[in-house]
Amino acid sequence: MAQQSLLDVQLVACSTFTTPSGVDWKVDSAATDSEALVEFAGRACYETFDKPNPRTAANDAYIRHIMEVGHMALLEHPTATVYIRGLSRSATHELVRHRHFSFSQLSQRFVHSDETHVVIPPLIDNDPQLRELFLSTVDEVRFAYSELMTALDNKLADEPNAILRRKQARQAARSILPNATESRIVVTGNFRAWRHFIGMRATEHADVEIRSLAVRCLEILKEKAPTVFSDFETSVLSDGSIMATSPYVTDY
């Protein structure tokens, strides 16, 4: 019986900052490590560690200023890594198009599960009849997958390497697995890349699944760098899903 998987995003790594020796600069106590790194990189460009401009002396004011003038390259220094579960293969295909990220994704060639875990689109999940049809179809595909695996195992019986035999069988049989099959993926990106991803995928024009992912990532990143992501505002759409937009993200 197919099992429903729900989106789960966890932060597993984020940049830390240590003031280098020999630099006479005091980190703003209100700044997070990632935000301190952004400011340090900017001040290193112009040797303004003495904070000559009172309007940008505070970390939050400094970061807002560089965003207003479009100096987004400074946001490429801090990075964040998340581990995502409960995301469909079709959604990961959209995710990996963001080439400034680094990815490590669950392999269907090496990992075999006795159960099928799927992500059900809300439009289907909210309708009992459609949900039943969806899950029964997934079960039929899973049965066909198991039959193919058995047949391929028999076909490859002369292969002495059991690991290779199973891998070859899986890589052939997996072609019939549904796009809704759950995947798991580690994603690392700098803050500029994360902002671009959120700007592109948290809009009302994006698919609801990847939009949910983008909004969840925004919530997580706001905790680590509130000023860097504070320009994004969320709102609720007519279908109850959440979107986010920023006046600084215009290249849709």
UniProtKB/Swiss-Prot annotation:
A motif (ThyX motif) lies at residues 97-107. The active site is at R201. Keywords: FAD, Flavoprotein, Methyltransferase, NADP, Nucleotide biosynthesis, Transferase. FAD binds at R97, H98, R99, Q105, N190, F191, R192, H196. Residues 7-235 form the ThyX domain. Its cofactor is FAD. It catalyses: dUMP + (6R)-5,10-methylene-5,6,7,8-tetrahydrofolate + NADPH + H(+) = dTMP + (6S)-5,6,7,8-tetrahydrofolate + NADP(+). Catalyzes the reductive methylation of 2'-deoxyuridine-5'-monophosphate (dUMP) to 2'-deoxythymidine-5'-monophosphate (dTMP) while utilizing 5,10-methylenetetrahydrofolate (mTHF) as the methyl donor, and NADPH and FADH(2) as the reductant. One of its GO terms (molecular function) is flavin adenine dinucleotide binding. PANTHER family: FLAVIN-DEPENDENT THYMIDYLATE SYNTHASE (PTHR34934:SF1). The gene is thyX. CDD domains: ThyX. This is Flavin-dependent thymidylate synthase. The keyword Transport does not apply. Belongs to the thymidylate synthase ThyX family.
